[in-house]
Amino acid sequence: MEIIGYYESPNQQELIGKIRACDWSAARFLADLLEKGTFDETLGGWGYLFLLLDGENLISFATLTGQDAVRDESLTPWIGFVFTNPEYRGHRYAGKVLAHAEKMAAKLGYGRVYLETNHVGLYEKYGYVYLENRIDCWGEDARVLYKELEEVE
């Protein structure tokens, strides 16, 4: 198993296909952003997409971006689009991708990351703390969580 960066991969079209095949509407939205080249523009001007692969199989993925569905420029960066394929759930693979994104955020000089979700208890087990509820860009209520990051040399 390995975590790769989408933008460093020579197989971007293949990865878009794997993301689009996930049974989650947000994954299809992410695939559209990548295909149209609007990922950075839509998500705060910059971003990373990390994918955990087992050979050719997509296990899990997450993004690290300047903005997410909760629009507030004072809160940055965001981890989003966190997904683990159902057949791989229960093994904490999302935690591996989260940790990778968190490490990148720390390398970029950030001391905290944010995440918005409707799940209760899922991200808390990875050290995330509830901040508050906010209305997202679709007008829906979302829980905003954060995590303090350790400095990386």
Model regions: which residues?
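Helix-adjacent hinge/juxtasegments
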Residues: D68-T76, F81, P86, H91-Y93
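Short loop/turn motifs at secondary-structure junctions and domain boundaries
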Residues: D40-G45
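Conserved acetyl-CoA pyrophosphate-binding loop and the N-cap/start of the following alpha-helix
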Residues: Y88, R92-H100, Y110
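Conserved beta-strand in the GNAT
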Residues: L49-L51, N57-Q67, W78, F83
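Short hydrophobic/aromatic beta-strand or adjacent loop that forms the aromatic wall/cage
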Residues: G47, E140-L145
